[in-house]
From Swiss-Prot:
Known function: Plays an important role in maintaining outer membrane integrity. Contributes to virulence.
Domain BON, chain residue ranges per copy: 46-115, 124-191
Gene: dolP
UniProt organism field: Salmonella typhimurium (strain LT2 / SGSC1412 / ATCC 700720)
Induction: Transcriptionally regulated by sigma-E factor.
Entry keyword Hydrolase: no
Protein name in UniProt: Outer membrane lipoprotein DolP
Species lineage: Bacteria, Pseudomonadati, Pseudomonadota, Gammaproteobacteria, Enterobacterales
Length: 191
């Protein structure tokens, strides 16, 4: 039988404690997000699955895979396509493919003509999304958990289940964040 040094056992125990803490925090964050989202947990799972299925369907088209950059976001069965395509034909084909995926009820095709953005722009988009989410979180005009934010090449896209007043407020808040070039909304309005 192999003997373990006391130092190795101690280090392993400490590392495992860190893993447990990270797992607990991660699980709590996911649980909180699921609980505050106005969609049912089932709908949230369906939307996540739909995003994967649409992305997979798009990647099966070799020309789309090689020549475009397309990100997929789903909210209550509505699919948002953002990114870049060298021509409108590929953009239209991407929309057609997305519509053919089971579970898709509507497609918002916001793919822009142009060359795919680079890593620097994509990183900046992530930063813009973080800033928009932070502003929505601190606003008393919008329930931030009702709004899904994605950014592509400085353009912010907002989806969600909101009142008209919340939708206008969310768009206004996003438009005031530095680095935002344009705000596009695709809300489902509730009374």
């Amino acid at each position: 039988m192999k003997a373990f040094s006391p130092l190795a056992v101690l280090i392993s125990a400490l590392l495992l404690q860190g893993c447990v803490a990270a797992a607990v925090v991660g699980t709590a964050a996911v649980g909180t997000k699921a609980a505050t989202d106005p969609r049912s947990v089932g709908t949230q799972v369906d939307d996540g699955t739909l995003e994967l299925r649409v992305s997979s369907a798009l990647s099966k088209d070799e020309q789309i895979k090689k020549e475009t950059r397309i990100n997929v976001t789903a909210y209550q069965g509505k699919v948002l396509l953002v990114g870049q395509s060298p021509n409108s034909e590929l953009s239209a084909r991407a929309k057609q493919i997305a519509m053919g995926v089971e579970g898709t009820t509507e497609v918002y095709n916001e793919i822009r003509q142009g060359q795919p953005i680079g890593l620097g722009t994509a990183s900046n988009d992530t930063w813009i999304t973080t800033k928009v989410r932070s502003q929505l979180l601190t606003s008393d005009q919008v329930k931030s958990s009702n709004v899904k934010v994605t950014t592509e090449n400085g353009e912010v896209f907002l989806l969600g289940l909101v009142t008209e007043r919340e939708g206008k407020a969310a768009a206004d808040i996003a438009s005031r964040v530095s680095g935002v070039k344009r705000v596009t909304t695709a809300f489902t309005y509730i009374k």
